[in-house]
């Protein structure tokens, strides 16, 4: 988690953002000042641990009123959060990591964005989000996909409900949303040479779109590394999402 690791550039601790925030290491919900420079300055330490790949929690802009340190409520899909550094800083970190024979995994979130994303103030289309008119909370029933007895209501609530009130649920069935997200992944791979993608909240998103996303990325980069977060309570639940699984009826994600 970059914000919690090391503060290599104090000049970006308190910079102007759209929303207010504070740096307070005594508060678990505030930002603590860690950044990309701090990671770069400690690559010796990371390498000495025997690390071969670094998975960073999301580094893209998370301009939210509270709890922005974790990065899981994106407000700009093409900009590194300036409190972590710049896009160029991210590229340099990856290059420096590669020089040591290590790799970098980028954390992406396509199920939802942050409620302070400009889309929420100027929505591209009404179906850009799910349940925009009436808030629906997801039931987090991640087994709904493969439960033969699940109700349509429970399955729809799982897929289309908002993760939390500050994380609007993106409608990946909208072809423009799907294209935006797919192109965003390819852009980042091309731009910074990141070695792999960790896709957050994988079972919460539309399975057809995510399958297409995987296909498009792998068509461009056949040897690429992708892992989806499928935080299940049972082994069979995790097995459903594995590549080549016989449990998911050909929906090879």
Provide a role label for each language-model segment.
Residues 35, 39-42, 89, 93, ...:
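Alpha-helical packing segments of well-folded alpha/beta enzyme cores
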């Amino acid at each position: 988690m970059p914000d919690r690791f090391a503060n290599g550039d104090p000049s970006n601790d308190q910079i102007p953002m759209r929303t207010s925030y504070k740096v307070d290491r005594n508060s678990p919900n505030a930002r603590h000042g860690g950044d990309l420079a701090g990671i770069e300055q400690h690559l010796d330490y990371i390498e000495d641990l025997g690390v071969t790949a670094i998975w960073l929690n999301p580094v893209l802009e998370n301009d939210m009123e509270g709890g922005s340190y974790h990065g899981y409520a994106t407000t700009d899909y093409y900009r590194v959060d300036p409190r972590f550094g710049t896009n160029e800083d991210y590229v340099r970190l990856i290059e420096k990591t590669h020089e040591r024979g290590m790799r970098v995994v980028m954390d992406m979130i396509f199920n939802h964005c942050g409620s302070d994303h400009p889309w929420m103030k100027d929505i591209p289309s009404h179906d850009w989000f799910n349940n925009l008119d009436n808030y629906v909370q997801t039931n987090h029933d991640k087994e709904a996909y493969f439960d033969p007895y699940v109700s349509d209501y429970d399955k729809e609530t799982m897929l289309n409900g908002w993760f939390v009130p500050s994380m609007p649920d993106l409608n990946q069935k909208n072809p423009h949303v799907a294209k935006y997200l797919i192109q965003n992944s390819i852009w980042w791979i091309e731009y910074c040479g990141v070695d792999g993608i960790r896709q957050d909240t994988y079972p919460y998103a539309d399975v057809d779109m995510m399958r297409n996303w995987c296909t498009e990325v792998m068509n461009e980069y056949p040897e690429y590394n992708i892992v989806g977060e499928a935080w299940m309570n049972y082994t069979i639940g995790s097995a459903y999402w594995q590549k080549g699984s016989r449990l998911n009826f050909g929906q090879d994600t």
